[in-house]
Amino acid sequence: MKRTYQPSNRKRLNKHGFRSRMATANGRRVLAARRAKGRAKLTVSDEFVG
């Protein structure tokens, strides 16, 4: 049986990246909350340089 988690960096960035967070009001709320908490990495995009 195939496992449910088949990692792909492209999908990860498209779903959880900075630009997708900025695209919706709720996503911007997530970023604001993470900034307020002092997170070093706001989104998964921060792990990728390019």
Swiss-Prot record:
Entry keywords, A to Z: Ribonucleoprotein, Ribosomal protein
Gene Ontology biological process terms from the UniProt entry: translation
InterPro entries linked to this entry: Ribosomal_bL34 (IPR000271), Ribosomal_bL34_CS (IPR020939)
GO MF, one annotated term: structural constituent of ribosome
Superkingdom of the organism of origin: Bacteria
PANTHER family reported for this sequence: LARGE RIBOSOMAL SUBUNIT PROTEIN BL34M, MITOCHONDRIAL RIBOSOMAL PROTEIN 34 FAMILY MEMBER
Family, similarity comment: Belongs to the bacterial ribosomal protein bL34 family.
Protein name in the entry: Large ribosomal subunit protein bL34
